[in-house]
């Protein structure tokens, strides 16, 4: 029964190490996705510390690849030192992922206040030129999220750009995709996106942080199983000094 249990633990452990390699790629992708998306919305969110969970996720992803390599070698060779190192590193990564989850929730709660403070400034500095980074950011968000203004299109009437142009219109990025003849005129509100951008930007950023949180939780659970299997192998060897290696001279014990 004990031999069957240890063999099963090793099989699961090798399989988990292969999963760790896949997880490494997924975590790095999630972290990179956060960076890319943040670059599109950075004008609406000034707190760069929000990127910290993404940085940690990428670092954890790189470390998981190394862990998978150590785990496979240690499991196949039944190296006591290797397995102990494997468990220790997994424990460190697990604690790190718990920190990521906590930080993710902390920054997720701050998103709404951060966006509310930043978006007011961005809309005030809009000048309608493609050379201005803030203007490009607003046009990009309005097209991508299908929104107009902070709370609705009427917010544009309070901007310096609207007062200077004096043509009673909003940026063309406010035009609905289906309104082919839209010129941004407030006289035709049905051609404009009715929803404001602030709520949608908040929702988008919170969704991104939730991706990070769920990725960290999912792989933390897998790592717990990996630590359990490695501990079973280690405990078996410590209780039974005569226990043979799983693979000895090319044959299974």
From Swiss-Prot:
Subcellular location: Membrane
Topology in the lipid bilayer: Multi-pass membrane protein
UniProt xrefs under InterPro entries: Tetraspanin/Peripherin, Tetraspanin_animals, Tetraspanin_CS, Tetraspanin_EC2_sf
Transmembrane segments: 12-32, 51-71, 86-106, 213-233
Chief site of localization: membrane
Ranges in the topological domain labelled Extracellular: 33-50, 107-212
Keywords assigned: Glycoprotein, Membrane, Transmembrane, Transmembrane helix
Stretches of the chain found on the membrane's Cytoplasmic side: 1-11, 72-85, 234-253
PROSITE patterns: TM4_1 (PS00421)
Annotated glycan sites: 127, 152, 167, 183
GO cellular component: membrane
Pfam name, any one: Tetraspanin
Function (record text): Regulates the proliferation and migration of oligodendrocytes, a process essential for normal myelination and repair.
Subunit structure: Interacts with claudin-11/CLDN11 and integrins.
Family that this chain belongs to: Belongs to the tetraspanin (TM4SF) family.
Protein name: Tetraspanin-3
Organism ancestry: Eukaryota, Metazoa, Chordata, Craniata, Vertebrata
